[in-house]
């Protein structure tokens, strides 16, 4: 797979909003000898959830450049005859395999979608409110009260694509990585004899007998890459995904004078970006051996092996010398690591519960004077009640006031200096204070 630069987007921000729960219904049966027909208001439907799903057919985040807002469907309101409102449809957003999902505000990593079909919930829908059928008691047989649905979650997300490749080719620009990937795979990258020809990661599929694996040409690595020189910090994150690092070194001496120094410079940049990269299996690929004499080559190979303590495979991407050995070695290592990974237990996706806050029974109340004769009751847990119920419903007001009175509302009003005839507001509901 060859990705054109114009289509390659690997970092975006999007906004997701889950659906709100539908409101419960106030309704009564039309039935003879039953007080007011008996309550039969149905519950509201749950709001739709928002999920991100790793889809192998999606290769970049380009689709999110022009569309950044994603909203799931709200739940429908409850109806009479105890009919529950329909749940809102869940929204599935397809992203490339290898996408890391972060909370854009906190930076917290929410999920790593590194397997095809892997799903993560990024916003939970609100639970539907209960209808008045739930509020009937032996003493309150015709309740005029129902709950509002909970609001669905919303958040800004940062999506960061880290390319999924089995082998990452790293090294200085112009050491022959693009030529090498075109020699061993089906990739056809742009190749020229000057630095930074490759400005996006090129991916190629390598076939070896009945086994295939993906190789990525990681561009932009030079001294200072971890700090952004040569776009290196942009591309180093793609190395994190690879099972194996193939460190390509130019041993010809024509453009790079000291292959050993080159090796350690790139390793240092990888370390600065993430020490974890140095723990990955690595082989050294000594390229351009066709441009150097056999005796001189042996000296350089010995220096590299002694200095790096790595297996060094001499190749020529131009003539093909050593390519078969290189592919065989890469396939062997990748195959072994894939078998090890496949033996790990896979996570099973379980859809979480919708947003539902338990109604608090205890409050820390505060009475605030907003104007002469006008007061507002505030409280840490009061917001849940205000959002859950329509205080224009008489029974909802009475239920809330009973709970507030148990928490000392009357005493708080007197202590604050509220006088008879003053207006007190709780949420959107206002009442005149009477002693």
Swiss-Prot record:
Its main location: cytoplasm. The keyword Nucleotide-binding applies. Residues 165-335 form the OBG-type G domain. It is found in: Cytoplasm. It is an enzyme of class 3 (hydrolase). Its EC number is 3.6.5.-. PROSITE patterns: G_OBG, GTP1_OBG, OBG, OCT. GO terms for biological process: ribosome biogenesis. It comes from the Bacteria. Residues 6-164 form the Obg domain. InterPro entries: G_OBG, GTP-bd, GTP-bd_Obg/CgtA, GTP-bd_prot_GTP1/OBG_C_sf, GTP1-OBG_CS, GTP1_OBG_dom, GTP1_OBG_dom_sf, OBG_GTPase. GO terms for molecular function: GTP binding; GTPase activity; magnesium ion binding. Keywords: Cytoplasm, GTP-binding, Hydrolase, Magnesium, Metal-binding, Nucleotide-binding. Monomer. Belongs to the TRAFAC class OBG-HflX-like GTPase superfamily. OBG GTPase family. NCBIfam families: Obg_CgtA, Obg_CgtA_exten, PRK12296.1, PRK12297.1, PRK12299.1, small_GTP. This is GTPase Obg. It comes from Thermotoga sp. (strain RQ2). The gene is obg.
């Amino acid at each position: 797979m060859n990705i054109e630069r114009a289509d390659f987007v690997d970092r975006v921000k999007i906004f997701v909003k889950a659906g709100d729960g539908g409101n419960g219904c106030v309704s009564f049966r039309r039935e003879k000898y039953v007080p007011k027909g008996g309550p039969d208001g149905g519950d509201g439907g749950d709001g739709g959830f928002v999920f991100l799903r790793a889809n192998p057919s999606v290769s970049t985040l380009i689709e999110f450049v022009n569309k950044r807002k994603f909203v799931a469907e709200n739940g429908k309101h409850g109806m009479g005859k105890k009919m529950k409102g329909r749940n809102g449809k869940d929204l599935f957003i397809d992203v490339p395999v290898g996408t890391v999902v972060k909370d854009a505000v906190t930076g917290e990593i929410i999920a790593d979608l590194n397997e095809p079909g892997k799903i993560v919930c990024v916003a939970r829908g609100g639970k539907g409110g209960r209808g008045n059928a739930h509020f009937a008691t032996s003493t309150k047989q015709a309740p005029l009260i129902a709950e509002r649905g909970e609001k669905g979650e919303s958040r800004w997300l940062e999506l960061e694509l880290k390319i999924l490749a089995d082998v990452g080719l790293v090294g200085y620009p112009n050491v022959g990585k693009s030529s090498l990937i075109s020699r061993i795979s089906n990739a056809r990258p742009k190749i020229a004899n000057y630095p930074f020809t490759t400005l996006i990661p090129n991916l190629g599929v390598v076939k070896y007998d009945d086994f295939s694996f993906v190789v990525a040409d990681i561009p932009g690595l030079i001294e200072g890459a971890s700090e952004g020189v040569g776009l290196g910090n942009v591309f180093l994150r793609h190395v994190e995904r690879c099972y194996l690092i193939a460190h390509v070194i130019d041993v010809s001496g024509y453009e790079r004078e000291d292959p050993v120094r080159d090796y350690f410079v790139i390793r240092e940049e990888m370390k600065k970006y993430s020490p974890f990269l140095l723990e990955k299996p690595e082989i050294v690929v000594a390229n351009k051996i066709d441009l150097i004499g056999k005796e001189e080559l042996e000296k350089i190979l010995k220096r590299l092996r002694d200095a790096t303590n790595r297996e060094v495979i001499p190749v020529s991407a131009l003539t093909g010398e050593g390519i078969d050995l290189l592919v065989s070695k890469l396939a062997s290592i990748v195959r072994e690591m894939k078998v090890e990974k496949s033996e790990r237990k896979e996570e099973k996706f379980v859809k979480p519960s919708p947003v539902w806050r338990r109604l608090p029974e205890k409050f820390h109340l505060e009475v605030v004077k907003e104007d002469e004769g006008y007061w507002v009751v505030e409280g840490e847990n009061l917001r849940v009640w205000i959002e859950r119920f329509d205080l224009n419903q008489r029974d909802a007001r009475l239920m809330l006031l009973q709970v507030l009175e148990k928490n000392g509302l009357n005493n708080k009003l007197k202590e604050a200096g509220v006088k008879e005839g003053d207006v007190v507001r709780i949420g959107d509901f206002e009442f005149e204070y009477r002693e």
